[in-house]
Each structure stands twice: as C-alpha cells, then as structure tokens.
C-alpha cells in the first residue's frame, strides 16, 4: 500500500494514496479547497477528545462534519485514551462505544508535597534514580519533566545534568535534534511544556510534573492524563513511573481557585 505523509505545513499535492495521514487542519484544508480524496472507506480520527480543546475543538468538529458529508458511506473510528465521559462523547458523535481498559505497561503514580526550592532537589534525585534503572529489554530509564512555562524549561534544564529544554518555540531542526537524541538514549531528560503532550512520541520511563499548571491555569483531567500517559512504552519499559510535585497553598490568580495540592488530589481522584 502507498502511504503519503505531509512534511511541515505543506499539503501534499497528490492525494491518490491508499492511506492519507494528516493533521486536523491539513485534512480540513484539503476538503475546503474542494480537492478530491477519492473514494474514502474508513476515517480514523485520533485524539478525538480534542473536541473539547478551546483552540482546535471547533476546527475538528467542522472537519468531522465536512468529512461525513464528503464520504457518507465511510466507517468512522474515533480514538482517545483520555476522554472523561466516553459514553456522552460516543452519543454526541453517533458512534458505538468500545472501551479497552488494559494498559500494556502499568503505571505507578506518586504524589509528593514540596516547596519550590525542594522541587529542584527532588527532580535531580528522581532523574538520577531513573538513569540507574534498566528495563528487561535493555532500555535505560529516561525522564520527561513537565513545567508551566518556556522560561522554567530552560531554568530547570540548566539545573539538571543531561537535560534539554523542549517547547513549541524552538525551530524545527532543534526540536528534531532533541527528539532524535532522546530516542537514541543520548539525552536522559527533557524539560518541556504541554507542547510535548500533543503528538510528539518520546519513549520515557518516567514523567514528573514540576507544576500542575499550563501557563497560569491549572491542568484539566484530559491534559493531565495525556501527559502522564507518556510514562512507560510497550517494548521499552516494564513500568511507567509518574511523580507529581505539588506545592501546598500555591495558587494562580487567573486559574481555578484551588491550590496546587488540592488540584493534585482532584486529578488523581
């Protein structure tokens, strides 16, 4: 079978492949410009929980409607690992609900209450601890650290040996270089924002939340589950480890009213 993948933001001119893979925006642009997708038999939409995303949700909903209009006989398969209410979403999409509860690699979740200064010491300890572990398939432990700003990405990366800062503001060649080095095991730790949660595949054994905020707003359940789902990859790791470093009493004026420790307990509940 022929598979075509677009590179960057450029939309492939030939759409005669057996399988066409694209972003929501890329496929939607093809439909809007009246280009023919041919006879479509199956449409698979990954990360369908993005319907609830403030920025991309309306675009995804519109694309689904236009695809259904363009390919009325096609089978639609919607995938997500982090839908909060799958029954309601299935009803909204007029789809049959199929739930699969088994995770190939089990996850251990740990909550540690700590202050800002203590967090850095804990981060260094957790990273060093992960590096000492080797899975049954021979892969050394690696860590993804989530923080709430690009500035913190650099500050934390400088404070942790072997760490690299990764965020959406980096140029593509630099992002690609970090992805390849991490994939090869040459970088032990990536410090990132929520940018990594959306679509980048890093095989990490451990995920650490230095902050439970995205910018100045607390993470919601979907965002949190998407991020912690990075811990443990089939074929690489035997166990995924997740650590939440929550600062009691920490609040953001523009976020929800809860403190970080309260948010942590709610997300884990």
Tell me the role of every PLM-derived stretch:
Residues 5-12, 164-193:
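Conserved helicase ATPase core of P-loop NTP-dependent helicases/translocases
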Residues 65, 73-157, 246-247:
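Conserved interdomain linker/interface between the two RecA-like ATPase lobes of SF2 helicase motors
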Residues 74, 202, 213-265:
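Conserved segment of the helicase C-terminal RecA-like domain
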Residues 29, 50-51, 85, 152, ...:
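Residues immediately C-terminal
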Residues 24-28, 33-76:
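SF2 helicase catalytic motif II
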Residues 41, 189-213, 240-245:
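A short beta-strand element within the Helicase C-terminal
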Residues 1-30:
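Inter-Walker segment of RecA-like/P-loop motor cores
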Residues 16-19, 39-42, 72-77, 141-142, ...:
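Loop/turn-to-beta-strand initiation segments
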